[in-house]
Amino acid sequence: MSQPLRRGVRAVSWTRVLPPRARQGQTRCLQIRAAAAEQPSSANGNNLPVVGTPSSAESADARFDVIGAPYSLLSVSLSASQNLFTRRGTLVGLSGKADNVVSTLSVLEPFRRAVVGVPFLYQKVSSASPVTALVSVRSPTTSFAVVHLDGSVDWMVAQRRALLAWTGRSLSIKPTINTSLSVSHWGSSEVTGRGLLALVGAGQLYQVEVKAGEQYIVHPSNVVAYTMTNNPPRPYRFKSTTLKFQVPGLKGWPSFIQDSKFIRDMSGSDTWKTAMNIFHKIRTWSRMTIWGDRLFLQFDGPATILIQTRGPRINEVLTSHEVNEIASAPRGLTIGPAKPAEEKKPSADEEYRKAAEEAVNAAPAPTRTVEQLEQEIRGSAQSIATLTKEGKVIFEKPGQQN
């Protein structure tokens, strides 16, 4: 028997004869490592990567770094004379020459932002020398994501309080107002130009890359931001149970009941209006709680989506009117696909020429072409102007005798 094998046998036999108390003093070190997670697949069968958001972004004048575990701080490195806009009350600390730093309170479009519930009070920080600032939020269950805009792709910030900080001389942020049934644009901010953008979300933030030809459906309360493409996200509604919940109305009753004086007086009373208001509130509440999981957004690739793991309640994202509109629609897309550009309608001259060609070709033996027919019609409609000695102008048609 070889020497290493003998040592192994002796070691095993020695441990067997040890008393239980002696065995308790022995320890063994274990290493536990997280296995690499596999990429999930999309419903279309193709690979749909769900990865973490970039932890840093850099431009010519600034740099954003997300630090902390979990991500809880944003480090901003600014060059001289570069402006940093951050939400009021989020600036934690600043390193550099404090005498060169200027901090002012900026009010950004308060009337437009207040209508959609977007914060409009921001702190503007600038310095004559390079500085480094730390930015954070009060909530302990948030994480940060940074986005570098190079001017080729615009972004839409879907959540009202997701915009934390930004920098860039040509960066423009405009709030969008919901003028119609547009689920994805309620309380959103359109970001265009070039610069750096810092977003904050509840829980962890992840980035979803949707390739061309793929579709991805996500709950609107979990969407933080997404790239703006020719195919905007559309509301989607899953199939639900056949349970119907309707508010009783008078239109379904027979006409002789609707025309009765008692029914007319009752429908115009305050008691009836209060009862109908209560029924409508109950219906809206049931759609937000019982059928609320049916309201989703469908994204068509190519697109990039930032999603958060902890979304707010549905009533913080959608209004009661939007919930009722979507819940009343059949399952599937509540808004049709993007319509292609409308075909150019033929002008009146083209229609006239086409009709003339059909009329000429319909004859058994056409003796005139369309051009000759047009010239004949144009000639019969001509008038000749004659200037008399008295200075008068007389219009005469061809062939007309005085």
From Swiss-Prot:
UniProt biased composition (Polar residues): 39-54
Keyword Transit peptide: yes
Transit peptide region: 1-11
Chief localization: mitochondrion
An example Gene Ontology CC term for this record: mitochondrial inner membrane
Gene3D superfamilies, alphabetized: Mitochondrial biogenesis AIM24 (3.60.160.10)
Protein's cellular compartments: Mitochondrion
Region (Disordered): 35-54
Regions annotated as coiled coil: none
Entry keywords, A to Z: Mitochondrion, Transit peptide
Domain of life per record: Eukaryota
InterPro entries in the record: AIM24, AIM24_sf, Trp_RNA-bd_attenuator-like_dom
Pfam family name, one: AIM24
Gene Ontology BP, a term: inner mitochondrial membrane organization
Keyword Mitochondrion: yes
Matches recorded under PANTHER family: ALTERED INHERITANCE OF MITOCHONDRIA PROTEIN 24, MITOCHONDRIAL (PTHR36959:SF2)
Family the entry assigns: Belongs to the AIM24 family.
UniProt-recorded name of the protein: Altered inheritance of mitochondria protein 24, mitochondrial
Source organism: Aspergillus flavus (strain ATCC 200026 / FGSC A1120 / IAM 13836 / NRRL 3357 / JCM 12722 / SRRC 167)
